[in-house]
């Protein structure tokens, strides 16, 4: 099975699109996100465009990505490297449906690793070291994103129960 059929045959409602639109996170590493599918079928650059309903392309060969302040804070294994498939800042910022929520490295050509979020459904798409180079510490960087950055994004806030509807209702019932 695949989360997205080859040939961009599912303009809407694919497993991966529904997963993202359900408020989940999809990360990719090594090369162009959603480009190739099960059995080597090719979606090309339109895979990303179709799944995110955007005009994003990742053709950024030779983008020297330098860790940002967040990169240093959350992904200490990340060092400067050359990315070939970075998210382009101008494209993301021009799209009303997507915004950056995490930029761990950036160069003149774009951002990678980086995570963007759909402002309508809160789903996230991220690229992590998208270049054909097996010497890069991809596993360490992705692990650090999961262990250090994601928990910071999904913090819980304590709610003071006093005066809330359930507390008030309980007090009213107790007084009867």
Model-assigned labels for residue ranges:
Residues 1, 25-29, 102, 124-129:
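Structural recognition of the beta-strand scaffold that forms the well-ordered cores
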Residues 28-121:
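An acidic, glycine-rich "communication" segment
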Residues 8-9, 13-16, 62-83, 138-143, ...:
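Short, structured coil/loop segments at alpha-helix boundaries
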Residues 3-5, 101-104, 158-159:
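Intrinsically disordered, low-complexity segments enriched in polar/charged residues with Gly/Pro
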Residues 1-45:
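Helical hinge/lid and interdomain linker segments adjacent to catalytic or ligand-binding clefts
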Residues 43-54, 109-112, 117-176:
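Extracellular ligand-binding/catalytic regions of CAZymes and related secreted enzymes
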């Amino acid at each position: 099975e695949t989360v997205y059929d080859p040939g961009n045959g599912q303009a809407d409602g694919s497993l991966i699109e529904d997963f993202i639109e359900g408020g989940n996170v999809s990360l990719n590493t090594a090369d162009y996100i959603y480009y190739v599918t099960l059995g080597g079928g090719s979606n090309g650059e339109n895979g990303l465009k179709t799944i995110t309903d955007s005009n994003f392309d990742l053709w950024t060969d030779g983008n020297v990505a330098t860790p940002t302040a967040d990169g240093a804070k959350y992904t200490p294994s990340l060092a400067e490297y050359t990315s070939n498939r970075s998210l382009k800042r101008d494209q993301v910022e021009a799209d009303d449906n997507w915004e950056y929520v995490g930029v761990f490295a950036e160069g003149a050509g774009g951002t990678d690793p980086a995570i963007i979020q759909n402002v309508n459904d809160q789903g996230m798409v991220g690229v992590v070291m998208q270049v054909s180079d097996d010497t890069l510490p991809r596993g360490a960087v992705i692990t650090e994103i999961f262990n250090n950055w994601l928990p910071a994004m999904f913090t819980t806030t304590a709610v003071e129960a006093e005066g809330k509807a359930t507390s008030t209702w309980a007090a009213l019932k107790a007084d009867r």
